[in-house]
């Protein structure tokens, strides 16, 4: 009889333990679901804030670009514009990362690069050639 009593009590303890483990698993899974839902909400709010910031930055960059667009720029302002254009490209690449590399490679047109170099050469060579021309003119006057 003692043996039957011990087996019955052991069985009751084992079933109670199994139920508590099952309840713990259910509460953990419910907690996980609630936690995951709250994380989704937080990500959604963060995404909305990030998209708002990106929109504000894009708007500010476009406003600055339009301000500098219609007047003669200094070299410093030109560098600021280049940085703004880079920021705009970076912000666009956040929205569409797979298209960013295509846009960057399309942006480097060989004709545009050649035109940039010729503009730089003209800007550098113009004053140098005028100085050489005036020096040669002065030498010819002294000789002649």
Curated annotation (Swiss-Prot):
Q: Tissue expression, per UniProt?
A: Expressed by the skin glands.
Subcellular location field: Secreted
One annotated GO molecular function: toxin activity
Q: Which InterPro entries match?
A: Bombinin
Give the keywords, sorted. Answer: Amidation, Amphibian defense peptide, Antibiotic, Antimicrobial, Cleavage on pair of basic residues, Cytolysis, Fungicide, Hemolysis, Secreted, Signal, Toxin
The reply on keyword Flavoprotein is no
UniProt record, GO biological process? defense response to bacterium; defense response to fungus; killing of cells of another organism
Record propeptide residues: 19-43, 74-123
Query: Isoleucine amide modification sites?
Result: 143
Respond yes or no to whether keyword Signal is given for this record: yes
Q: What cellular-component terms does GO give this entry? A: extracellular region
- Role, per record: Maximin-3 shows antibacterial activity against both Gram-positive and Gram-negative bacteria. It also shows antimicrobial activity against the fungus C.albicans, but not against A.flavus nor P.uticale. It has little hemolytic activity. It possess a significant cytotoxicity against tumor cell lines. It possess a significant anti-HIV activity. It shows high spermicidal activity.
Query: This chain belongs to which protein, by name?
Result: Maximins 3/H2
